[in-house]
Design a protein with these regions (language model features):
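Secretory targeting and sorting signals
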Residues: 2-36
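Right-handed parallel beta-helix/beta-solenoid
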Residues: 36-67, 290-323
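N-terminal extracellular ligand-recognition/capping segment immediately after the signal peptide
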Residues: 54, 58-111, 117-122, 127-129, ...
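Right-handed parallel beta-helix
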Residues: 87, 95-246, 350, 389-488, ...
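Beta-propeller domains
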Residues: 320-335, 457, 465-503
Length: 618
């Protein structure tokens, strides 16, 4: 199939909207009722992570492991808006063989991770895979959200899986792959069922011994990794600090190269914290160190720089714990592990201690009650927040996550930056919800590493006046660096960047589908729509690379946006690189009139599914 033929994907997924919303609601009851949770009595130091964290070790019968992971997949593969959450953790050792591989599917809200200090400490001979989902005969990866793979090696042996040869990871947003070593071919699209559309994606700190097939993935970010080869681009493939990355080529050349945006190094990075088990069977959390101007993996040449924090220094929370209980533990100097589940919060979780770690296992989800802010992080150095979903509640919250109060911005040091890794926001979809802004960053020197802020376009409680949300991300701090900023469907500016010396490497956006009229969606008199990415008028320095914004206005009336990117014309020359807009479907109306300010052509029904690009601005 042509990689440019994305037109019908939006029709198929939206026509199936009611089916999607209904089919993804599941009844209660965990997998443990059918398959006993693995445990090892010899590991007396093993913490209690709750019934939805499965810990495997190589001494277990493979049939037991297979039965457990298959039972989780059977529940989660179609469970898009369910409340069940799981973490599947593998102790150091080898699982499966070339003749009897361990192959299993990863569904919604499932985190698969090795428990070694290095990705090479856990080896799976087989595959840990994702498949297309099929609705009305259309099989795509467009809604393969909220799942992850990390900290292990896969020796890709897909014996007995037919067309599915190698490692398949056809995912969309909020489905990161981190600290993974894959030996053999990897594909980011599921070409075994059609039309195979896909819209991802994020990889970091990983090594691929074999070509990665991008296929139909319309955009993707690879950061600080090592590649043997990369097959192709579609709209916006971005590589930052990647050894073996394709050469810079934007816009793409038909039957030639790209579209690729390639940066030799990443300016400042800090990998996500992760759980591991040491040689004495003691559990710890490893906190990687900050790196500057780096390329390649942190572990390829030896141990990842950083520090280990013993599990005794963590409060291990369960969904039944109140926010008051969690805050009490944080005030007494504990770090925080959030185990799988949905947490109903009657007060804000307050992270106030420097270098505090908040680590989610299995996509824990925070839901505010009474319009509160779900979590606030003080303007202090070194806080690590990773692996958490922030859902909006029934009553409007002014924000869901606040990083820094705004009046202490200098305390977050560049040498020890606060870092948000794999942090996701959702307005509606699972349950009706409202929030004016999802994420507000007031602190300086913050790293944002894989953020998806999504005002739901399908599911429960969805509508222009139902799941209301002005803005996905507001950055007020200086020296903030973002990698993989995915922000979609908000009703005003989707991103507002007010800080100086900020950098965004990769941006993916879809404008809201559902403005009911042009009059209802106007930035100002005479300015149609709202820009997807707004850089504040007073900002004197900002850099952006590989930034795309798409439109699909589906209410049957022409809706236009004057432009997708709005920035001061006084920015230094060539501050922004490789920008694009796209009119997604011939079923849509209106479009985007310019790419950035008044520069760049229009994306309308006259040029559907065709990138309109600006290589450099101003």
């Amino acid at each position: 199939m042509s990689l440019r033929k994305f037109v019908s994907r939006w029709n198929s997924i939206l026509m199936a909207g009611a089916l999607v919303a209904g089919a993804f609601v599941t009844t209660g009851g965990g997998v443990a009722a059918a398959v006993a949770a693995p445990s090892d009595p010899s590991h007396s130091s093993q913490p209690n992570f709750g019934s939805n964290v499965y810990i495997f070790n190589p001494s277990m019968l493979q049939s037991q492991i297979q039965a457990t992971v298959d039972a989780v997949a059977a529940q989660q593969v179609s469970n898009q808006f369910g409340t069940q959450r799981y973490a599947l953790l593998f102790e150091p050792g080898t699982y499966g063989t070339s003749t009897d591989p361990l192959n299993f599917q990863v569904g919604y809200y499932t985190a698969v991770a090795g428990l070694g200090l290095s990705p090479n400490d856990v080896v799976i001979n087989g595959s840990v895979y994702v498949r297309n989902q099929c609705f009305s005969g259309q099989c795509t990866a467009l809604v393969n959200f909220w799942r992850s793979l990390s900290n292990l090696t896969i020796n890709a042996t897909a014996t007995g899986l037919g067309c599915y040869s190698g490692e398949f990871w056809p995912v969309s947003q909020a489905a990161p792959m981190r600290r993974v070593h894959i030996i053999g071919p990897t594909t980011l699209m599921d070409y075994c069922t059609n039309p195979s559309f896909a819209s991802g994606g994020f990889i970091a700190d990983s090594q691929f011994d074999g070509t990665v097939v991008n296929g139909s993935q319309q955009q993707w970010l690879v950061r600080n990794s090592k590649l043997d080869g990369w097959s192709n681009g579609v709209w916006n493939q971005v590589f930052s600090g990647v050894v073996g990355a394709p050469a810079q080529c934007f816009p793409g050349v038909p039957k030639g190269c790209g579209p690729y945006t390639t940066l030799a190094t990443s300016p400042v990075t800090r990998e996500a914290p992760y759980l591991y088990e040491d040689s004495k069977n003691h559990f710890n959390v490893f906190v990687p160190a900050v790196q500057h101007n780096s390329a390649g993996t942190t572990w390829g040449g030896g141990q990842t720089p950083g520090v280990s924090v013993p599990i005794k220094n963590f409060f291990i929370a369960e969904p039944t714990d109140s926010a008051g209980t969690i805050n009490d533990a944080l005030r007494h100097g504990k770090n925080l592990i959030l185990t799988p589940g949905v947490y109903q919060l009657d007060r804000t979780i307050e992270v106030t201690r420097p270098d505090a770690v908040v680590l989610g296992l299995g996509f824990p989800t925070l839901v505010p009650e009474h319009g509160i802010v779900s979590m606030s992080v003080e303007s202090t150095k070194g806080v690590m927040l990773s692996g958490v979903i922030f859902d909006a509640g029934l009553k409007n919250s002014r924000m869901l996550l606040q990083v820094g109060s705004g009046d202490e911005r200098g305390e977050n040091e560049a040498s020890d930056p606060t870092t948000l890794s794999d942090v996701f926001f959702r307005i509606g979809g699972a349950t009706p919800g409202k929030a004016t802004t999802s994420l507000v960053v007031n602190s300086n020197n913050v790293i944002l590493d894989d953020i998806w802020a999504w005002r739901a376009d399908h599911g429960n409680g969805v509508g222009w006046k139902a799941n209301t949300a002005d803005t996905g991300v507001i950055v007020n701090g200086d020296n903030v660096t973002a990698y993989g900023l995915f922000v979609e469907h908000y009703q005003k500016y989707e991103v507002i960047w007010n800080g100086n010396r900020g950098t965004d490497i990769f941006f993916q956006n879809e404008m809201p589908y559902d403005p009911p009229s042009q009059a209802a969606w106007m930035e100002a008199r005479g300015v149609d729509g709202w820009a997807a990415f707004k850089v504040g008028n007073h900002v004197s320095s900002f850099s952006g690379y590989g930034m795309g914004s798409y439109s699909f206005f589906n209410q049957g009336v022409n809706i236009f946006a004057a432009h997708s990117f709005e920035v001061p014309v006084s920015l230094p020359a060539s501050s922004l690189h490789d920008l694009l807009t796209i009119f997604l479907s011939t079923a849509g109306f209106g479009g985007i009139l310019h790419v950035i300010n008044a520069t760049g052509g229009s994306s309308t029904i006259a040029n559907p599914d065709t990138p309109v690009t600006v290589v450099s601005y101003p």
